[in-house]
Amino acid sequence: MFFSFYHSSFSSLSSFFFSFFSLLLYMLVLLQIFPKNYYEAGTLSIRVIRKNTFNHSYNNIKNIHYIHCGYPNIFNNCRNYYMNNFYNNNLSAPFKNKNNYMHIFFKIVEGNKKKKREHPFFKYLFHMNMLEKSGDKKNTVISKITESCQYGDIRKYMNMKKESLEEGEKNKSGEEYNKHVEQNNIKDEKIHFKDGTFIKSKEEEIENEKGGTICLKKEIQKNVLEINNNTYNNDTKYLSNPKGVTNKSKQSKKEIEKKKKKKNNNNNNNNNNKIKSEKSANDTKNIPPIPKNTEDRWNDYNKIKEYAKISNVYLGAHISASGGVQNAPINSFNISGLAFALFLKNQRKWESAALTNENIKQFEENCKKYNFDKNFILPHGSYLINLANPDKEKRDKSYLSFLDDIKRCEQLNIKLYNFHPGSTVGQCTVDEGIKNVADCINKVHKETNNVIIVLENSAGQKNSVGSKFEHLRDIINLVHDKDRIGVCLDTCHTFAAGYNIKTFENFDNVMKQFDDIVNVKYLKAVHLNDSKSDIGSGLDRHENIGKGKLTMDTFKYIMKSKYFKNIPIILETPDITNDESIYKYEIQNLYKLYFEK
């Protein structure tokens, strides 16, 4: 009896010690595998499509990725478990009530809770890019990554997501799914990614949450697009940043409000840009492109030339000289321009490469090839030039650029050169600014031979010189060689400076005023622009013909008036077509105005 009792007690005791040491050993193993503080309370959200499309989610959505934190076996088990259960639609505890979810939530519990062993491998699931995001404290999950997780590796994956997945990565995932389809005899078409878009040969119809039907392909594409653009539903939870990375929830209210305001401003700007782009698309809808066929371009050019012979009005545009000044005549021919303006060098730099002999030779050849009269070529001066500046050092710098431009005109045998008189920069009177401009013109006349300097009237900006006809007159009066000075009237600038040119009668009165003050013999060119701003605004805002504050009578007057015959009339309107075809369209319509009664 005693032996039996002893045997029983010993057996129980040994069983107890065996269990105890086994449990202790097991715990030690666990502690080795899962370091201290490895678990934390929270929820990890992974974006999927719907119950009906679970079979496609892993490969199609491409936002579920696994980051190996140091334990390959657990990592692989985790991945396999997830893949198998997901594909077979046999989802256990964390996936209950899946019928109504667009998101599946993986539960991760604290290590000191009873259910600490519940799906430990989900610790290895990370949504790419989620580590960069954090919400308020309620939504913050997995607030720190332990030493066992290599933050650098995670960062690398995050950057992959941020930069968008490589095409090879997408195709690899597609192949993985296709392999799964074959192995499991799933009755479905294979899939692949192309240019970031999910492609499927058959567009299945599935029932959506509202009871309607939706195209599977479109549903998947929508989700892929949302993920690539980092846009998620409000119920999506985000992983917070690892230790050492700033948590948004800890930011001050001021910073949060500031960021919200900035975001709203960006949204407004995006909306404005969208409206502008839509408006631009509507504006350009009826504008024909420049013909690709050279013969067609010659036919269009010859028509315009006939109109010019009848009207004695020579229209053109400020065109691109990209690739060299020799390309300007070609570009002008393409838009059927009989006159043109160009920059002889970079208009926003003080120094530019000199013209080569080849540039000069080809420019001459192209002018002859396309029958350009050099009296109708009007180069535009650099925007940096300010001859009215009272600061001698700065004015001398402007003068050297001014002189360089005019010498380039002489190299190309061009007769006219147009520039803005400049600004007093608020440091001298307008009269002093006028004298500075005239002194520079007199000086450049002595250093060059025959180029006519053409003063462009300004729009009336603060401290500007040249917005009033009297300014132009006073500069001319101070210039010694009157044969080498002239004026270019810009219609937008004239209107913005306060001269009413909206009707035939008003424009005619303005031109009589110009003749009385300046003398019409000095009118050497016109810049033809509509105006975005109203009369007297002082704003230099060019607009396409018929789209601004001026009227078609303004432009009809230009076409018919005696004041604008046999001088270059240059369009400087916005190139809304981005290929200069707008200028051809405007030139053709302007000649039509001449023939209207």
Curated annotation (Swiss-Prot):
Q: Where does Mn(2+) bind?
A: 493, 540, 542
* Control of this protein's activity: Apurinic/apyrimidinic (AP) endonuclease activity is enhanced with increasing concentrations of Mn(2+), while Zn(2+) initially enhances activity but subsequently inhibits activity in a concentration-dependent manner. Co(2+) inhibits apurinic/apyrimidinic (AP) endonuclease activity at concentrations greater than 2.5 mM.
Leading EC class: hydrolase
Keyword Cytoplasm attached = no
Give me the ranges of the annotated region Disordered: 232-296
Q: Describe its PTM? A: May be proteolytically cleaved into a 59 kDa form.
Q: Which residues bind Zn(2+) 2?
A: 456, 490, 527, 572
E.C. number: 3.1.21.-
Q: Which residues bind Zn(2+) 1?
A: 380, 420, 456
Compositional bias (Low complexity): 265-274
Subcellular location field: Mitochondrion
Q: Offer one Pfam family short name for this entry.
A: AP_endonuc_2
Mutating residue 542 to N: effect?
Answer: Loss of apurinic/apyrimidinic (AP) endonuclease activity. Loss of Mn(2+) binding. Impairs DNA binding
What name does this protein carry? Answer: Apurinic-apyrimidinic endonuclease 1
